[in-house]
């Protein structure tokens, strides 16, 4: 993750972007940039945890650098785009919008959610899990993996999760849009090996 001042998350987002690019190119598509939604925490870092735990995040559009780029160019672009989200008011504005949608009647809320969901291919999330191993019913957990929910007709969910010093990446794909998702996973693995 030291290349171009990038974080581990930047490297993984770049690799996901490259995998999508290669997957589409192998099927004869010109891989223009595609957007995914990424959750952004809107709870202040210094805020104490509330009595009742819960998430306080907004889904923000992240244009993935899926067009044809060299690996280091793609990494630099992934970092630039991720940094842009971190310094944008979009998360706070989106959180307010999602809160308002949640208060609308069900039919209106569904239409609005479907409208916004159609702007992205899916959701990509990075979850920092426990840094040390955990036990469940006396047995040490060897790994954990999460699955990303999707909305509307979104076709691809990517969950990046770290646990006990290991990062795992899970892909969830709509079989009608990505009938050979294993090839997308192999493209990701190949990208991580370069």
Predicted regions and their residues:
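Surface-exposed, Lys/Arg-rich phosphate-binding patches that contact polyanionic backbones
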Residues: 1-6, 78
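Low-complexity, glycine/alanine/valine/leucine- and proline-rich hydrophobic stretches
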Residues: 118-193
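Glycine-rich, charged/polar anion/phosphate-binding loops
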Residues: 22, 44-48, 106-112, 143, ...
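Helical lid/core segments from catalytic subdomains that handle acyl or acyl-like groups
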Residues: 48-130
